[in-house]
Amino acid sequence: MADAAVELPGRLAILPFRNKVLLPGAIVRIRCTNPSSVKLVEQELWQREEKGLIGVLPVHDSEAAGSLLSPGVGSDSGEGGSKAPGGSAGESTKQDTKNGKETIHWHSRGVAARALHLSRGVEKPSGRVTYIVVLEGLCRFSVQELSARGSYHVARVSRLDMTKTELEHAEQDPDLIALSRQFKATAMELISVLEQKQKTVGRTKVLLETVPVYRLADIFVASFEIGFEEQLSMLDSVDLKVRLSKATELVDRHLQSILVAEKITQKVEGQLSKSQKEFLLRQQMRAIKEELGDNDDDEDDVAALERKMQNAGMPANIWKHAQRELRRLRKMQPQQPGYSSSRTYLELLAELPWQKVSEERELDLRAAKESLDRDHYGLTKVKQRIIEYLAVRKLKPDARGPVLCFVGPPGVGKTSLASSIAKALNRKFIRISLGGVKDEADIRGHRRTYIGSMPGRLIDGLKRVSVSNPVMLLDEIDKTGSDVRGDPASALLEVLDPEQNKTFNDHYLNVPFDLSKVIFVATANRMQPIPPPLLDRMEVIELPGYTPEEKLKIAMKHLIPRVLEQHGLSSTYLQIPEAMVRLIIERYTREAGVRNLERNLAALARAAAVKVAEQDSALRLGKEIQPITTTLLDSRLADGGEVEMEVIPMGQDISNTYENPSPMIVDEAMLEKVLGPPRFDDSEAADRVASPGVSVGLVWTSFGGEVQFVEATAMVGKGDLHLTGQLGDVIKESAQLALTWVRARAADLNLSPTSDINLLESRDIHIHFPAGAVPKDGPSAGVTLVTSLVSLFSHRKVRADTAMTGEMTLRGLVLPVGGVKDKVLAAHRYGIKRVILPERNMKDLAEVPAPILSGLEILLVKRIEEVLDHAFEGGCPLRPHSKL
């Protein structure tokens, strides 16, 4: 409560309230975020605790109301300060602030306030300090001089409210006594009206009987929603008679507005239409039937279902079908077996979006490109193709665009690209997972004759998004299988064909549904498992793996902020330098995408979270300075930039924050402690190629490019060839081909003195592909197999810094292979310096980033002899008479 005996200091720090007024006796909660306000609270309240007093001074957006003054820019001692306009309420002046850009209109009168509660917080992730302050208005003051103290203002003030002695003398005034009685009578009448609606006004009635009337005037007015000018007028009312007169007028106005609103409500309720009366009677009849046990809820539910079906916008032929099914349902009892399935079917018909679509906003290609660049780093060609797709949609919205199929390793952003397309088109997005689907019914639905039948995933997805034109992602389309229940890939042929999906027939739905408005996007890790007819209906866009530099940029820009947010941290708690991220990429992850990188970053964040949560120095920063005794709270929000007002619910605690510890900076020691010893080493290739018979190949998998070692050894035997490593038929044939070529050219390769000597005389050859649990197939290991065999027979080691790929023929020609970019990136990840490629793959090098190519020596070859010449230190000299 405002205290007439409070001792007001000569100077007060000034907290500005823009277009809001704090009256004596009122309580507000403010959230200080402005640096100047934060500094004021820090120095004047936080450090002084319960001894601190501040001044709250209204700030105008215009000079329309009240008396104004302009702030000086002098020091706290008053130099350069501006004098208040000697008590003349009508005069006003204005002056630019320090920066000369903004004019601040200060009111000449304010209210001294004390802090009842302080709470300090730190925003994440910025680390900005904020304060939540509960202030109580004490007494009015007049500003005599305003000056600057650092980033905030202070004022020389004089008290305006009466002292205790003056109040005792004024209370004997007959006019004041009459005004007090009139105010209390009006306030009591208001409380009586409010008691009928609110349960909490009893405490207000107690205030009315115990608190002096001159204080009640401010408290009551502070609880009303009135204009800023009226608030200022109340603040300027120093004379008790004037203040009580204005307060009585405002209370009476508030009372009359409540009475008028009640009168209008009663009038409207008394003019119920015939249909409304019938509705009320039916509700009463329903209650009577419930008491008698004669409930017809099911009939009411069927009627509601019929109304829902009428509003679904079904085509005429489907509406006729639905009506027949509805008539059948009405004739059935809820206990009958088919009742539940019929009702579920009709509910599906009513919930499907037959006509409802998402309204597409006008496409802004520039904004779409910026969104793609912001959400996805790199992938230039892929993003360009998406922009082209969106450009065609903008020029011809009804065009049936191609079905895009993003093919690439896991973790390169295939799913998020589809989500970005939906975001650019302002359409809803739905993901249909096809991984492991082997039943055609998952696409077309089950027939209703089966128990537990349900619609297919496409129809069910459309029901969930409630629009007929979403962007639908068919995820992992290469993971579908087939068995006796059918082939889901064949069912997708109808879905992805724009000429057929206009009348898509789900077995459960049993009526045609138009899928032509749906934009389909598919994802896959590999193209090989996708049936050719299905692949022909899609435009394949390959997403290669990321380079180490791209991974670094993605981690710093996207992954680290996301990981910190997911673990409740910020940069003030954990910092991961670029050098450490680079070490994680090089030593702990070797992948095409960034999922393992994110997992390792999450492991570091968890380790930091444990330490932060266990901090012994974690202290509560909330300070309860004085208990809140007032029951009326100002619940309005300040609309200025200095402070933000918020409601304080009765009895609710203000949340506490914790001291901000010094940030934890990740170093190599922490990496090894959290992630363990490095999993990969640049010297791995050199260690494994330390003996003859081992060569380094490059292969492509569904996870991107990889380095594949090939090991060959000889032993006593009968000239047999043994192959291990879970190999497919194609790679087995490549091994047979390689051995045949080496045996035929043994003399030319200086592996035997003459061509008559059999290299396999009394010995067997065993070729092994390490990582035996991983299936391997394809022709691209041909040159690697030849190099391994030549190394074995010549007892020469292959260069450890060289990797190769290429298919070979029986005549020694090197044929082109696929996945060149991913293979080159894999070689770079493993620290390989030289890469041997077929010459006909030179065109594919244009897709490899220039920084990667600059760090590698690319060797293009036409024949296997050139491969051998590059693979061995000092070359592999052939005999001059060599032919073919």
Curated annotation (Swiss-Prot):
SMART domains: AAA, LON. SUPFAM superfamilies: P-loop containing nucleoside triphosphate hydrolases, PUA domain-like, Ribosomal protein S5 domain 2-like. It is found in: Peroxisome matrix. CDD domains: RecA-like_Lon. The keyword Nucleotide-binding applies. Residues 67-101 are annotated as: Disordered. ATP-dependent serine protease that mediates the selective degradation of misfolded and unassembled polypeptides in the peroxisomal matrix. Necessary for type 2 peroxisome targeting signal (PTS2)-containing protein processing and facilitates peroxisome matrix protein import. This is Lon protease homolog 2, peroxisomal. It comes from Oryza sativa subsp. japonica (Rice).
